[in-house]
Curated annotation (Swiss-Prot):
Binding site for a divalent metal cation: E265, D297, E310
Entry GO MF terms: DNA binding; endonuclease activity
EC number: 3.1.-.-
Region (Central domain (CRD)): 158-250
Secretion signal, residue range per the UniProt entry: none
Family label: Belongs to the Bax1 family.
Residues covered by region (Nuclease domain (NUS)): 260-364
SUBUNIT field: Homodimer in solution, forms a heterodimer with XPB2.
Protein name as it appears in the record: Endonuclease Bax1
Keyword Cell inner membrane: no
One annotated GO biological process: DNA repair
Annotated domain remarks: Has 4 structural domains; the N-terminus (residues 1-136, NTD) interacts with XPB, the central domain (residues 158-250, CRD), the nuclease domain (residues 260-364, NUS), and the C-terminal domain (residues 414-481, CTD). The CTD (residues 374-481) is not required for DNA-binding. The 2 nuclease domains are found in the NTD and NUS domains.
Gene name as annotated: bax1
Length: 481
């Protein structure tokens, strides 16, 4: 982004027209790039561009310099605050001759343990010395300028509508990471982001995050943006900005922090580490509610039980109202993790856990357990069986339910006997009844038949005589025919 005073645009009727740089500005870009050399101070460059400002648009000249400065590496910062160095020097008052000046410098240098004249003004921009000049082509500088200009204008946005034909999931994923407020619509697919101009606080951070998102929007094959900008000092007016598939924009990887540490990231890590048996999915598939696309922050699931999780952080009143309308129409359970500053009363009748700085994962786990217990008590268990041997584990796995739930809802099927953990067909059981398992090794029988044979042997009247902890001899109970 650029300082607002360097933004170049004109207004025609109610539309904002950005003044992008073009190939006609290549000579200027090359000339300014050539001024940035190792060993130079920024103050020297400022003096050298004065004549260029008289020939070219001074805003464009200053913007090029501003961007190139961000790519420079400067001499290391002072080990001592420069203001402290100046305070120590100025204690001695005005100096009238060179020898007295040198004596004072030596005294202060010795006291502070540093080459003070090297750092005395190092906190001033004009005194910063370049140790590594930027390596960038004039073409890339122009594209970067154009992207920065567009980002700067969008900082004044009240609303930004985005149309894309590809990578829309990536855009939404980034938007969530960046904490941007948005609405998604179907037919045609579009996203409506609330702009910084809708906020009364944190506009700087929000605006910068929206600028970061723009880089992902323009990476789509086909994209279009329509923005409503709020401009004017005394009298505010809303103007429109439209742009589609403009090629002279470039994403550059600059040393900047793209994403802040977020509540969402901490929640995801805590959930993964603490809550076992549940699977958490970040950015699940979108849900369509009344032709609006709703993409929850997370989906957590255990078997057939699905719960969507939405983290409500820094939202405006209007955004909350719109979101609530959608949340109430989603048919699956939704858990809302709510920043307590927003007020819980707005979410009456919904599943809400409040948080202050971070989400208490133990409260989430407790809520999920209560929901799971309620679900298991109300779930309708229906199943059929086929084959000779059917285990409860097999049925539970197919139904995505705990074995104990199946056990509480055992069904009786004609032609089958239910033992402790297995259904066995009567025909197969009769066949086994005709076998003689007397004096056989249990270990060998389990290996030949499977684990179910233990329960079958007990049903048929056999007993086990253990020969240690790992094997037993099967003995026919003489009382049983």
């Amino acid at each position: 982004m650029l300082p607002w005073e360097l933004a170049r645009f004109s207004i025609v009727k109610d539309e904002v027209l950005p003044h992008f740089a073009t190939n006609e500005d290549l000579d200027l870009a090359n000339e300014i790039i050539s001024l940035f050399k190792a060993g130079k101070k920024l103050g020297e460059i400022d003096e050298e561009i004065e004549y260029l400002e008289k020939i070219y648009d001074h805003k464009l000249v200053r913007a090029f310099v501003k961007l190139l400065t961000r790519l420079c590496e400067f001499e290391l910062d002072s080990p001592i605050p420069p203001i402290q160095i100046r305070r120590e020097l100025f204690k001695y008052g005005p100096v009238l001759d060179e020898k007295e000046r040198e004596d004072i410098i030596q005294k202060v240098s010795k006291k502070l343990g540093a080459d003070i004249m090297r750092f005395v003004f190092s906190d001033l921009d004009e005194e910063k010395k370049i140790i590594k000049a930027p390596t960038i082509s004039a073409e890339d500088l122009i594209r970067w300028y154009n992207l920065s200009l567009l980002q700067t204008l969008l900082f004044k946005a009240y609303k930004l509508t985005v149309y894309v034909s590809s990578n829309w999931k990536e855009i939404i994923r980034r938007a969530k990471w960046l904490g941007l407020m948005y609405f998604a619509y179907d037919k045609p697919l579009r996203f409506e982001f609330l702009g910084p101009a809708t906020l009364v606080k944190l506009t700087e951070k929000y605006g910068r995050n929206l600028a970061v998102l723009l880089q992902f929007i323009i990476s789509s094959q086909n994209w279009k943006i329509e923005a409503e900008l709020v401009l004017g000092k005394k009298f505010k007016r809303v103007y429109k900005l439209k742009l589609a598939n403009f090629k002279e924009l470039k994403e550059l990887v600059i040393d900047e922090k793209r994403f802040d540490s977020s509540v969402e990231e901490k929640f995801y890590k805590d959930f993964t580490n603490v809550i076992k048996g549940w699977k958490i999915i970040r950015e699940p598939e979108p849900l369509v509610v009344d032709n609006r696309v709703f993409i929850p922050d997370f989906l957590v699931e255990k078997g057939n039980l699905k719960v969507y999780v939405e983290i409500v952080g820094f939202w405006t009143k209007e955004y909350i109202k719109e979101k609530l309308d959608k949340l109430k129409k989603v048919k699956y359970p939704i858990l809302i993790l709510l920043n307590e500053e927003l007020g819980k009363e707005k979410f009456n009748g919904m599943n809400v856990i409040t948080y202050k700085r971070k989400i208490d994962i133990s409260l989430v786990y407790k809520w999920l357990r209560e929901l799971e217990n309620k679900y298991l008590n109300e779930v309708k268990v229906d199943y059929t069986i086929s084959g000779d041997i059917i285990s409860l584990n097999e049925i539970a796995s197919k139904l995505s339910l705990p074995v104990e739930v199946i056990r509480k809802n055992i069904k009786i099927f004609p032609g089958y006997i239910f033992l402790k953990n297995y259904y066995v067909s009567e025909k197969f059981l009769e066949k086994l009844r005709n076998e003689n398992f007397d004096n056989k090794s249990l270990k060998e029988l389990v290996s030949a038949y499977g684990d179910y044979i233990v329960e079958v042997l007990e049903f048929l009247g056999y007993k086990l005589k253990w020969q240690g902890i790992s094997d037993a001899i099967v003995i026919k109970d003489k009382k049983v025919n």
